[in-house]
Structure formats: C-alpha cells, structure tokens
Amino acid sequence: MGYPSIYPTGVTIYNKEKAYSGYTNFPSAKGAQLIDMNGNEVKLWAGLRRFPNKILPGGYVMGTTGARGGKYAYQDQLDLVQVDWDGHIVWKFDKTELVADPGKEPVYMARQHHDFQREGSTVGYYYPNGEPKTDSGNTLILTHENLYNHDISDKRLIDGKIIEVDWEGNIIWSWRASDHFDEPGFDEAAKNALFRNPGLHGEAGGDWMHINNFSTLGENKW
C-alpha cells in the first residue's frame, strides 16, 4: 500500500469504544479495496481506478478504468463506470468530449475528476435516507473543459465544468465556472494575478478555478 517504512503500517489505532464499526473503501495500487476494521481485505475490484471510488447499495462501485496521458492532460479520467460485485461494468459514460491530442487518434473521454453524484444521494454514496440509484437515474459529474476567456486570462484555461448525464448517457445540463467569474468577488489584485498566471500546468493550460467537490441541495423548507 505504500513505500517501505520503519513506521507501523496497516491498522495502527482501533478504539472499539469510539470507532463506528463498518467497512472502509479506499483506492490502492491494486484497485478499489474494501477492508474491515482490522485491515483485512474483504473485497478487491482489481484495476478499478479512483477519482474517487464510491460504493453504492447492492455491492456496486463507481470509478474509472483509466486516465488521459501526455502533456496536454491534467487529472482527466477516460470514463466514469459503475461495476457490480464481480467487477463487470453495468454503466459507463465517456462522451463529455472528443479529445484530439496531437499525435494521437481522437477518442471520447469523460474528463471526469474529483467528484460525481448519482441521483438519490447528495454525496454520491449511501447514507440513511439518501440512497443512490443503481439501475436508473441521472449522474452529476465534475469535468474539465479547455477554453479561452479573456476576462480571466489570455492563457488557455482548464475550466471546471459540472454536467448532468441521464442513464442513457445524454448530457442534459451543464454549468461552467468561467461563466460565473464575477460572482466569487475577486478584487483587482487577485484578477491581475490570475490573468498573469491562472495556475498554469504547461501545455494542459491554466487550472484557474480548481474544484474538488460539489453537492446537490435538499428542498428549501421555506
């Protein structure tokens, strides 16, 4: 699970009176791994990458099968998949964009990173009274889109984009961070700094508004 170390590895602290008993899913070098409270491997979905992995009711897991490579890539995943307990893909999305990197054949990709949510849950996985759907429903996916917006910078940008995808893989709604540049309240000094260097990552572009997660909101009782 890590580099050789003189420090203890595995489960190093387990206070049964204070720790809620259950299972932990985490990404390992081998794939999506499920362990018990003592660190014993309960299940391994070999080769299922993460960004992240989320367990759904019925023994399903969501993740990705691979990442975009090369100097034009920045954290882009090829797809978002749902696999069953045996690792068979039962749902897949990879049609955010047809990516044509120089010197490579064009390929459709999800360009997903960091977060996604399946309908029925505000976080993307099960919790009491919040059960994500496993055989239907829409999925919100955090993705990237390269563009130019001269209000932000004259450099090529890596924009944060949220898309909503139905069960058949159709994009039915989208939201881009760059369309809301005036809303965070950047002062002139911050805007000037962003314009000169919007978080550049070489040929991939400037990651000007790095988004890690999002959540849907419940109904407003007012």
Predicted feature residues:
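Histidine-/acidic-rich catalytic cores in large beta-rich domains
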Residues: 1-222
